Amino acid sequence: MVIGYTAGVYDMFHIGHLNLLKNAKGMCDRLIVGVTVDELVAYKGKNAKIPYGDRAEIVRCCKYVDAVVPQSDMDKLTMCKKLGATYLFVGDDWYGSEKWNEYEKQFLEAGIKIIYFPYTQGISSTLLSKMLE
């Protein structure tokens, strides 16, 4: 069984989130999604508009998602190992950065491949939040 993992805040769930989850599910048998807990969102200097429990339930109800787990830190490698994930799915805005090039090496050493999906243009939780202000 091929297990995939992705993580995010999923605040103000939108079509970009749905596209990522749909594409990810197309590449694995079981898709596990980490939803960032409110404390980690705050640590990163932001505030989620929707509380963790609601965001987790919204993601859990998506037909492409097999399981939801809390993302309480930024250590995706440890989480992938814990879950037995073969793939980590992320947005392509990280592709080619020095940090993610190094992550790719670390993940490959652990037998996990990072798959980058294109961001859906014209939509983001940040953009939606600004539109509502």
Regions found by a protein language model. Name each.
Residues 1-133:
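Nucleotidyltransferase catalytic core that binds NTPs
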